């Protein structure tokens, strides 16, 4: 056999023999140790001396060192660090909305990237409870007496997070019949008050949704066309059911139809919406709800794909905050049973009352599924409007955002 011609000597290839220890070891040692020349090093950059020495066991200070208190402190400090990062991301998103940079749709990538990061962090925080669950109730009881009157309710950052997202003060469950801010003093109280006065993420998103292209009555007029199509569709549905022979099945279908009709037509009752808004059962303005539903229906259009992702991430934040509360409730129930909390609250009973839609901020986005209709009921677009939804709006002067939001 002549063998492979490409390996022949006639081609002039000369292969070096392979070594067992080879050149890989040499390459792995080819770098330069820059740290030996001085300058910033890892520990100094992260200020690890402060971070790693910030665990003071109260049990040890009282002369009775309890092993699991260290885990308890580390876990809660990790929570607070992640809360700080969430607030950092949330503030940057709010600033983009606040300064009008979101009018340039190219900035929406920043918004959804940072909101996605918030979602991923919250997923981590929900899972982190499993670490605390490695501690038994008896283990916790060994050092619990040293914690009072400290309480998780006193987490300033978590309360700031609630306020900045948009939890309504009127819907908060009172803490021992007192306003939640009464548990904070001095600068902390001032920060909470300031966060209540600032525009929330909910309010900023609401204003953004109200500007959804296609809502203009003298333009595409999505809302007017949707109402017309739904009324027509309901009439056709009624005619189909009415034409059937009398039977128990027909009665059931007619009853279901009446329910569907009431729900869908209520969508166009602005006074009813305002009434539900005043009761806290709805959070978005009537026009913002229209914008959200339009994005929901036309989410496959290029211009609405990114806005739809944002609405999805906002719902994820709400869901994960609820899961976090629920996991917290379960952990407290496991550790304390029905005993009072270290801060003096009713413990499990109080926490359980916070796992509800009262603390959901973007509840209207979840409820959009209530108004799903057959695709052929959704208003069709003419070529001009369809082309319009392929074109993003941008403004060079607003594209360059401030340093803080970069």
Curated annotation (Swiss-Prot):
Query: What superkingdom does the record give?
Result: Eukaryota
Name any cofactors this protein relies on: heme
The UniProt record lists the EC number as 1.13.11.11
- Residues reported to bind substrate: 72-76, 144, 342
- Gene3D superfamilies registered for this protein in UniProt: 1.10.287.3810, 1.20.58.480
Going by the record, the broad EC class of this enzyme is oxidoreductase
Reaction catalysed?
L-tryptophan + O2 = N-formyl-L-kynurenine
Complex and partners: Homotetramer. Dimer of dimers.
What the protein does comes down to: Heme-dependent dioxygenase that catalyzes the oxidative cleavage of the L-tryptophan (L-Trp) pyrrole ring and converts L-tryptophan to N-formyl-L-kynurenine. Catalyzes the oxidative cleavage of the indole moiety.
Please state what the protein is called.
Tryptophan 2,3-dioxygenase
Ranked from the top, the taxonomy reads:
Eukaryota, Metazoa, Chordata, Craniata, Vertebrata
């Amino acid at each position: 056999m002549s063998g492979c011609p490409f390996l022949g000597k006639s081609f002039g290839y000369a292969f070096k023999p392979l070594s067992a220890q080879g050149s890989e070891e040499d390459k792995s040692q080819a770098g330069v140790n820059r740290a030996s020349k001085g300058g910033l090093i890892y520990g100094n950059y992260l200020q690890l001396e402060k971070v790693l020495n910030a665990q003071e066991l109260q049990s040890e200070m009282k002369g009775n060192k309890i092993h699991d208190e260290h885990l308890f402190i580390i876990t809660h400090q990790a929570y607070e660090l992640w809360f700080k990062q969430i607030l950092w991301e949330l503030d940057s998103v709010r600033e983009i909305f606040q300064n009008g940079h979101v009018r340039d749709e190219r900035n929406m990538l920043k918004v959804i990237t940072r909101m996605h990061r918030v979602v991923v962090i919250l997923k981590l925080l929900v899972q982190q409870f499993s670490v605390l669950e490695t501690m038994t109730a008896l283990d916790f009881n060994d050092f619990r007496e040293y914690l009072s009157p400290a309480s998780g309710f006193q987490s300033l950052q978590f309360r700031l997070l609630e306020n900045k997202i948009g939890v309504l003060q009127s819907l908060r469950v009172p803490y021992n019949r007192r306003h939640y801010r009464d548990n904070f003093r001095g600068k902390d109280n001032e920060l909470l008050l300031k966060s209540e006065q600032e525009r929330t993420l909910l309010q900023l998103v609401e204003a953004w949704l109200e500007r959804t292209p296609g809502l203009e009555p003298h333009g595409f007029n999505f809302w007017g066309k949707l109402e017309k199509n739904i009324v027509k569709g309901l009439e056709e549905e009624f005619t189909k059911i009415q034409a059937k022979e009398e039977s128990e099945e027909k009665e059931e279908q007619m009853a279901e139809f009446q329910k569907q009709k009431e729900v869908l037509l209520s969508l166009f009752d602005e006074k009813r919406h305002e009434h539900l808004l005043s009761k806290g059962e709805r959070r978005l303005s009537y026009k913002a709800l229209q914008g959200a539903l339009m994005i929901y229906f036309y989410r496959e259009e290029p211009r609405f794909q990114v806005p739809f992702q944002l609405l999805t991430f906002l719902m994820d934040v709400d869901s994960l905050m609820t899961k976090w509360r629920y996991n917290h409730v379960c952990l407290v129930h496991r550790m304390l049973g029905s005993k009072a909390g270290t801060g003096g609250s009713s413990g499990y009973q109080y926490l359980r009352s916070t796992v509800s839609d009262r603390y959901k901020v973007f509840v209207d986005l979840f409820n959009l599924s209530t108004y799903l209709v057959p695709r052929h009921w959704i208003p069709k677009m003419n070529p001009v409007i369809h082309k319009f939804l392929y074109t993003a709006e941008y403004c060079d002067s607003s594209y360059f955002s401030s340093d803080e939001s970069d």
